[in-house]
A protein has these predicted regions:
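Class I SAM-dependent methyltransferase Rossmann-like catalytic core
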Residues: 1-26, 198
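Conserved SAM-binding loop of SAM-dependent methyltransferases across substrates and taxa
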Residues: 14-26, 34-47
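Eukaryotic short linear interaction motifs
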Residues: 35-39, 58-61, 90-91, 122-126, ...
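Adenosine-cofactor binding site in Rossmann-like domains, unifying the SAM/SAH pocket
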Residues: 35-79, 83, 92-95
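Catalytic phosphate/metal-binding cores of nucleic-acid and nucleotide-processing enzymes, i.e., regions
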Residues: 86
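A short glycine-rich, Lys/Arg-flanked "PGG" loop and its adjoining helix->strand segment in the class I
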Residues: 95-113
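Class I S-adenosyl-L-methionine
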Residues: 124-202
Length: 202
């Protein structure tokens, strides 16, 4: 989002994504979609074709689009990279955050990449989410974590995930047609004390 691009929020996350991509994604498979500034990837047009979207676009080159309303039939298995940079934390409902992750897996090709950026307190100081639970949620919808970065006392956590090959039952899972473990579908307290209430539910 444009707010998250500010230096007071941690700066442009595309720098981390571009640092990680070489060696993980063939140059011919550089298409990405995410919520970014329109010129974030201009220097990399030789191998990246990106389509920036935002719920309320403030720039003519950013498509105004609700990620949760993207047509599944025409986009399933069509994307190589999806960047959800400071996006999940702006989705109001915990279950819609889970739906966004399921849709991301639906839209990605097998072995595609999902880049997630969250405010660090969403993972380190949440009553309902820690890194282990985030890993479980991602695995349940078909992702494995390949890279993670954060600084102790920092503002953000960066997570890069690989879309794993799905079985027939797994293909139903990321579409929400198969039951998930109960600890991933309802809020379960993981920490006590003064915490925030950020959660992701499937």
């Amino acid at each position: 989002s444009s707010i998250g691009q500010g230096s007071d929020r941690g700066g442009g996350s595309e720098k981390v994504l571009l640092e990680w991509l070489p060696g993980l994604l063939p140059e011919t498979h550089g298409k990405g979609k995410g919520k970014e500034k329109p010129d974030n990837y201009d220097r990399y047009r030789s191998w990246i074709s990106n389509t920036p979207i935002d719920l309320r676009s403030r720039h003519p080159q950013i498509k105004e689009q609700d990620f949760l309303q993207i047509d599944v039939a025409t986009n399933a298995g069509q994307w190589d990279v999806i960047s959800l940079s400071l996006v999940l934390n702006f989705v109001p409902q915990a279950r819609d955050r889970g739906k966004m992750l399921r849709l991301a897996r639906t839209f990605l090709r097998n072995r595609g990449l999902l880049f997630i950026v969250l405010p660090l307190p969403c993972v380190q100081n949440s009553r309902y989410l820690d890194f282990q639970r985030l890993t479980q949620i991602l695995a349940a919808v078909g992702f494995s974590i390949v890279k993670e970065r954060h600084k102790q006392g920092g503002k953000l956590i960066y997570v890069l995930c690989r879309a794993e090959q799905l079985s027939v039952s797994g293909e139903q899972t990321h579409l929400g047609e198969e039951a998930f473990p109960p600890e991933l579908t309802a809020k379960r307290s993981l920490r006590t004390g003064d915490r925030n209430n950020f959660a992701i539910l499937l």
